[in-house]
Swiss-Prot record:
Catalytic machinery residues: 190
Principal cellular location given in the protein's record: endoplasmic reticulum
Family membership noted in the UniProt record: Belongs to the short-chain dehydrogenases/reductases (SDR) family.
Annotated transmembrane regions: 11-31, 270-290
Gene Ontology annotations for the cellular component aspect, listed alphabetically: chromatin; endoplasmic reticulum membrane; lipid droplet; nucleus; transcription repressor complex
Entries under InterPro entries matching the protein: NAD(P)-bd_dom_sf (IPR036291), SDR_fam (IPR002347)
Record's protein name: Epidermal retinol dehydrogenase 2
Residues reported in the UniProt entry to bind NADP(+): 44-68
Entry keyword set: Endoplasmic reticulum, Membrane, NAD, NADP, Oxidoreductase, Transmembrane, Transmembrane helix
Source species: Homo sapiens
Amino acid sequence: MSFNLQSSKKLFIFLGKSLFSLLEAMIFALLPKPRKNVAGEIVLITGAGSGLGRLLALQFARLGSVLVLWDINKEGNEETCKMAREAGATRVHAYTCDCSQKEGVYRVADQVKKEVGDVSILINNAGIVTGKKFLDCPDELMEKSFDVNFKAHLWTYKAFLPAMIANDHGHLVCISSSAGLSGVNGLADYCASKFAAFGFAESVFVETFVQKQKGIKTTIVCPFFIKTGMFEGCTTGCPSLLPILEPKYAVEKIVEAILQEKMYLYMPKLLYFMMFLKSFLPLKTGLLIADYLGILHAMDGFVDQKKKL
């Protein structure tokens, strides 16, 4: 009898909390969710020397954040630093760091802690793409993809998460990819690294949830191709439904998701529907849709930036 009462109580609590969370989600779907103030927050952005990382730095500069910029490209990173100051940032710190090297990450992280303070918003943005078919891709390039696109997240989390937990305040941002949701022809190593980054960020979020560390937020971003040069030459078969994203639009959406403490951000919105279809459609139907949207041959025109130099 007592077992039945206990089970019933547990069920009612579960149903009540579930209903409340659904109602809350519906309300915020209709009304704008409040945005948090990031003025004075120490924001670390990896891969800040160009592309998406640079644009993210400029957005946070306008919001009054303290910027910590990491990139392996010293010249590009210093240029971003200069642009951030021109955009209104009063405190900007640029560090040359190869995020693929664990020892280097830990060394520069210690510098940041001593010279700037505890990072409260960590944006793992640094990424590389080889754009080669699996059997054509040298082992060292595949290893480099994993080192930059995934393993760097392990080292930066290890370096900065403890202080966030101690302060019960922090935000972990993973820039994954639509290629971290579904396999793509010509991107085997990239997809694998982005799947890993997604799964890692989600798992650490679950750890913080179970440990009731409510002050630690997570945002996982999965965009389709962005016009930053990284995927130059890539195409889409249906631009009206699945466009290659403009960098300004992508950055605005990413920053908005961070300010609203949104867990998942897929861009464009069609990706949410595509992931839903993938869960139940027959394989052949899914492949037909991918072919229609041009996804199966999106990488055919890819231009390797290293070959251009």
